[in-house]
């Protein structure tokens, strides 16, 4: 029988529900259980694919092409699993599916209501996420906080699950903030008490409290919360601020969180062996070197817009025993005149993805600086496309070269819209999304990075591709197309082999990086950056 764990939040948002859920998932996986995890987002968008990065942060793409919440990145990195489209559910997605069924007459003339139709659809998504992965345990995080009007149908569905599958198969974990008032010199439990009262008013009695705090929590405070919130004292778990996120699973295990969960759900499984994870954390906290990477982006005011990029850089830094020092460079501010000032101290330059005209000229200048000064450079998605544009302009003499996306009237459309995208009008869910194969060119930098594999599978999110009309011109000038689709039609990786490292990929390699298994192309880039720093000392 599948076990269901539901993680809710109270008092304030952004208190780390996703990290708690992911950490618990890692502990249960290390007990030998097959775990999957999903996020409920109560907003009305179908998915975050068309949302501004300033509103939502990055869009995380799964193997099967779902555009999802960035928390799924945390889930995959912590638990080391690949999730699917059932792992992110929004209000908009549920309502659109229910309304589509109503239009088809599938409800046989019934009045369509929140209960039972919306709640039934939500419960079906929970169960589908478990069955499609054949999981022993599914952890479902509900976005937002208890008391938000948008969350009510989701919480009602969670309440009903207890009756549907049995109380011994369901566990409710409530995460809250425990504020510390310096003036009073004490922690305040009232916000948590009121949050639990609100949750209980909706018919959900939490079985565990996870309290987010900056300071150590005395047992007396835990006992008080246990008494007023009607949970066992040992089930009041402290989630204190840490230096590195990957410490959190170990901290939770030290408080027997996973054992309490297993006892409640009647799971008779061995203790979690966290030896390898602990060794990884110890290494992360004792890195001997540093390397400086300039990240040139258009959304740098909100680092969450590049969350997976940053995490992938860190993972590859761990593999090189190096901490990554990031210089956040706003592409809008970068010009040919100030490129040396902004980029001159960098050991490596990364140009990540994006959409639209703004900031593209600055990114092109960053790529040009990397090429002309032989600074290791990695381009991702739009960064790959602009790598081609930069080469066309400044090496091939095509001064007005551009992407069709950025200038439909350009005489040199180096990057063109994909043929199957030409007549598409909807913006959401219509990109080339998900896992696709990339055939590697033997002897190339890309092939070396991937241990000379012939084909790798990587996740994509784009609508435009390199225009093959110009391929011969590029190759004649020494530009290497080191990764292509199996039919040779789509360019996936480009490089200049004579440089220290000058490689750009159309796909998003960062989405498959893990702390204990860094993505290979990122690792090759960071290795080159570390070497570049050593050479310049």
Curated annotation (Swiss-Prot):
Example GO biological process: pyrimidine nucleobase biosynthetic process
Enzyme class: ligase
Residues that, per the record, bind CTP: 13, 148-150, 188-193, 224
Binding site for ATP: 14-19, 71, 240-242
CDD domains: CTPS_N, GATase1_CTP_Synthase
Alphabetical UniProt keywords: ATP-binding, Glutamine amidotransferase, Ligase, Magnesium, Metal-binding, Nucleotide-binding, Pyrimidine biosynthesis
Domain of life: Bacteria
Protein family according to the UniProt entry: Belongs to the CTP synthase family.
Protein name as catalogued: CTP synthase
Species assigned in the record: Streptococcus equi subsp. zooepidemicus (strain H70)
Underlying gene: pyrG
């Amino acid at each position: 029988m599948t076990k269901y764990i539901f993680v809710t939040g109270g008092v304030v948002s952004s208190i780390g529900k996703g990290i708690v859920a992911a950490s618990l998932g890692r502990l249960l996986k290390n007990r030998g259980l097959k775990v999957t995890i999903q996020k409920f987002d109560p907003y009305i968008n179908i998915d975050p694919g068309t949302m501004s990065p300033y509103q939502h942060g990055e869009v995380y793409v799964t193997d099967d092409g779902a555009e999802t919440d960035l928390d799924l990145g945390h889930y995959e990195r912590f638990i080391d699993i690949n999730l699917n489209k059932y792992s992110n559910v929004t209000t908009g997605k549920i309502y659109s599916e229910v309304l589509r069924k109503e239009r088809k007459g599938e409800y046989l003339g019934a009045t369509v209501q929140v209960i039972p139709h919306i709640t039934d659809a939500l419960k079906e998504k929970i169960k589908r996420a478990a069955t499609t992965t054949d999981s022993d345990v599914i952890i479902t995080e509900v976005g937002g906080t208890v008391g938000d009007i948008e969350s009510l149908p989701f919480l009602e569905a969670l309440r009903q699950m207890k009756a549907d599958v049995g109380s011994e198969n369901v566990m409710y974990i409530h995460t809250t903030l425990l504020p510390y008032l310096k003036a009073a010199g004490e922690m305040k439990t009232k916000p948590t008490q009121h949050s639990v009262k609100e949750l209980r008013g909706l018919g959900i009695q939490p079985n565990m409290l996870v309290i987010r705090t900056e300071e150590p929590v005395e047992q007396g405070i835990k006992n008080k919360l246990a008494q007023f919130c009607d949970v066992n004292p040992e089930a009041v778990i402290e989630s204190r601020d840490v230096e590195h996120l990957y410490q959190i699973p170990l901290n939770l295990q030290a408080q027997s969180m996973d054992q309490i969960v297993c006892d409640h759900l009647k799971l008779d499984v061995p203790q979690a062996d966290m030896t390898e994870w602990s060794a990884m954390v110890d290494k992360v906290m004792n890195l001997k070197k540093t390397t400086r990477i300039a990240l040139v982006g258009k959304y740098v005011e909100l680092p969450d817009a590049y969350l997976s990029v940053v995490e992938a850089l860190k993972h590859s830094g761990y593999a090189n025993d190096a901490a990554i020092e990031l210089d956040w460079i706003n592409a809008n501010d970068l010009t040919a005149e100030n490129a040396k000032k902004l980029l001159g101290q960098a050991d490596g330059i990364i140009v990540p993805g994006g959409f639209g005209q703004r900031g593209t000229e600055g990114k092109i200048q960053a790529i040009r600086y990397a090429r002309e000064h032989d600074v290791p450079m990695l381009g991702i998605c739009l960064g790959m496309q602009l790598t081609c544009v930069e080469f066309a302009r400044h090496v091939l003499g095509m001064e007005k070269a551009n992407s069709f996306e950025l200038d439909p009237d350009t005489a040199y459309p180096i990057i063109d819209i994909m043929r199957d995208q030409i007549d598409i009008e909807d913006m959401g869910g219509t990109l080339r999304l998900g896992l696709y194969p990339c055939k590697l060119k033997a002897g190339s930098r890309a092939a070396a990075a991937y241990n000379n594999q012939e084909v790798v599978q990587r996740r994509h999110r784009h609508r435009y591709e390199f225009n093959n009309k110009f391929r011969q011109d590029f190759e004649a000038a020494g530009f290497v197309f080191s990764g292509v689709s199996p039919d040779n039609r789509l360019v996936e990786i480009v490089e200049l082999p004579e440089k220290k490292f000058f490689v750009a990929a159309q796909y998003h390699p960062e989405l498959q990086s893990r702390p204990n298994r860094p993505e290979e192309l990122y690792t090759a880039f960071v290795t080159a950056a570390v070497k570049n720093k050593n050479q310049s000392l």
